């Protein structure tokens, strides 16, 4: 008799994705982040669902409803802070996951990579709209500043912004639609993640060496299931520590003040995970130029496969490229720091320099470095 998990139409899909899936025997802990992202998404959907049961998307009551969740709902404070800090955890895993893809050349799986970039955009949109919902000062002004950027689009810009706002300013209509979009997007993300996996399983996983691993595969279960559980436990313990000891460490104190359209906060800044893009946006004095740079800073990931000039896939055996990669990481950390600083000397200059270096490394320095390495290897 054949095992039911290999014959049942539903079990068969689960089996070929998580149980009998052939996986390279040498994939390191950097390959854990996919499963961690899945866990983050499930956790965000669940905590978000319970928050939505008590939240009201009305400008008059939104802030009070969040206060009510934290004060009066059983473990409401825990659900809220798990959701808020879960987003930070989500982005930490996302950035590490993308970084792994860049380092080991996983972007050569074109469909998987491009859907991944789409996923990144979708998660960023979700997080931005979620930040608006508590209707604190930073929520309101963040929404105003970021949506206003669309007015830089020639000809249709102003109409587009007013259409998104549902009026002539960020108001009740904006909050209601942002809540609707914030609720639906995670399910779209989940569907996209399914397609992401579908395309990944067409080719099989990459591995640290970047070489073909068909000759040496092991079943996903029990080897990588247990490895993923360990990763999940580490992540959950980190998240629990953050939520239970310093839940407001990554938040903005301004968001504990109810939204006031008549009072602009001295420093408007997004959550930490958007600061690098915000710094790139601010480093260009022209509005349209800034918006283009902002979008391109992430869209540039899509053309990375075209810029791959190396004869080897992974950076494992390419010390010069490794060096450039870590300079890029340091540059992104610098941009993140600058994004949170006021617009004044010397931060403006540092931001402009870091932005130029970011695009230079990706577009020119990395491909040239790879070509030099090819020459050195007489390849």
Swiss-Prot record:
Binding locations of heme b b566: 97, 196
Location in the cell: Mitochondrion inner membrane
Leftover remarks: Heme 1 (or BL or b562) is low-potential and absorbs at about 562 nm, and heme 2 (or BH or b566) is high-potential and absorbs at about 566 nm.
Disulfide topology: none
The encoding gene: MT-CYB
GO molecular function per UniProt: metal ion binding; ubiquinol-cytochrome-c reductase activity
Alphabetical list of PANTHER family matching this protein: CYTOCHROME B (PTHR19271:SF16)
Positions that bind heme b b562: 83, 182
Cofactor note: Binds 2 heme b groups non-covalently.
Keyword tags: Electron transport, Heme, Iron, Membrane, Metal-binding, Mitochondrion, Mitochondrion inner membrane, Respiratory chain, Transmembrane, Transmembrane helix, Transport, Ubiquinone
Membrane-related topology note: Multi-pass membrane protein
Function statement: Component of the ubiquinol-cytochrome c reductase complex (complex III or cytochrome b-c1 complex) that is part of the mitochondrial respiratory chain. The b-c1 complex mediates electron transfer from ubiquinol to cytochrome c. Contributes to the generation of a proton gradient across the mitochondrial membrane that is then used for ATP synthesis.
Taxonomic source organism: Crocidura sibirica
Required co-factors: heme b
Quaternary state and interactors: The cytochrome bc1 complex contains 11 subunits: 3 respiratory subunits (MT-CYB, CYC1 and UQCRFS1), 2 core proteins (UQCRC1 and UQCRC2) and 6 low-molecular weight proteins (UQCRH/QCR6, UQCRB/QCR7, UQCRQ/QCR8, UQCR10/QCR9, UQCR11/QCR10 and a cleavage product of UQCRFS1). This cytochrome bc1 complex then forms a dimer.
Residues that, per the record, bind a ubiquinone: 201
Coiled coil, from the record: none
GO BP terms, alphabetized: mitochondrial electron transport, ubiquinol to cytochrome c
Domain of life: Eukaryota
Ranges annotated as spanning the membrane: 33-53, 77-98, 113-133, 178-198, 226-246, 288-308, 320-340, 347-367
Protein name per the record: Cytochrome b
Family: Belongs to the cytochrome b family.
């Amino acid at each position: 008799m054949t095992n039911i998990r290999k014959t049942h139409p539903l079990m068969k899909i689960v089996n070929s994705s998580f149980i009998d899936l052939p996986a390279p025997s040498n994939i390191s802990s950097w390959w854990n982040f996919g499963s961690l992202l899945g866990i983050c998404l499930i956790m965000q959907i669940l905590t978000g669902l319970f928050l939505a049961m008590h939240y009201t998307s009305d400008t008059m009551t939104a802030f009070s409803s969040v206060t009510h969740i934290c004060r009066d709902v059983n473990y409401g404070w825990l659900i809220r802070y798990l959701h808020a800090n879960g987003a930070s955890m989500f982005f930490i895993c996302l950035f590490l996951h993308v970084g792994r893809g860049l380092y080991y050349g996983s972007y050569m799986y074109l469909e998987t990579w491009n859907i991944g970039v789409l996923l990144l955009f979708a998660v960023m949109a979700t997080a931005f709209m979620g930040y608006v919902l508590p209707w604190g000062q930073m929520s309101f002004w963040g929404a105003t500043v970021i949506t206003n950027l669309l007015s830089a689009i020639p000809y249709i810009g102003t109409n587009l912004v007013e259409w998104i706002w549902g009026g002539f300013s960020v108001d009740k209509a904006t909050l209601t639609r942002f809540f609707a979009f914030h609720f639906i997007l995670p399910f779209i993300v989940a569907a996209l993640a399914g397609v992401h996996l579908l395309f990944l399983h067409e080719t099989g996983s990459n591995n640290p060496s970047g070489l073909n691993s068909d000759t040496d595969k092991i079943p996903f279960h029990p080897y990588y299931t247990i490895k993923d559980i360990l990763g999940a436990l580490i992540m959950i313990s980190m998240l629990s520590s953050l939520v239970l000891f310093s839940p407001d460490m990554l938040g903005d104190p301004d968001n504990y003040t109810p939204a006031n359209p008549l009072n602009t906060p001295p420093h408007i800044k997004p959550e930490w995970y958007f600061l690098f893009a915000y710094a790139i946006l601010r480093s260009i004095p022209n509005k349209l130029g800034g918006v283009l740079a902002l979008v391109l800073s992430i869209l540039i990931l899509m053309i990375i496969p075209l810029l791959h000039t190396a004869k080897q896939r992974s950076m494992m055996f390419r010390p010069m490229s490794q060096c450039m990669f870590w300079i890029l990481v340091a540059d992104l950390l610098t941009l993140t720091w600058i994004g949170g600083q006021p617009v004044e000397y010397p931060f403006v200059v540092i931001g402009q320099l870091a932005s130029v270096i970011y695009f230079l490394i990706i577009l020119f320095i990395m491909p040239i470095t790879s070509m030099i390495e090819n020459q050195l290897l007489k390849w």
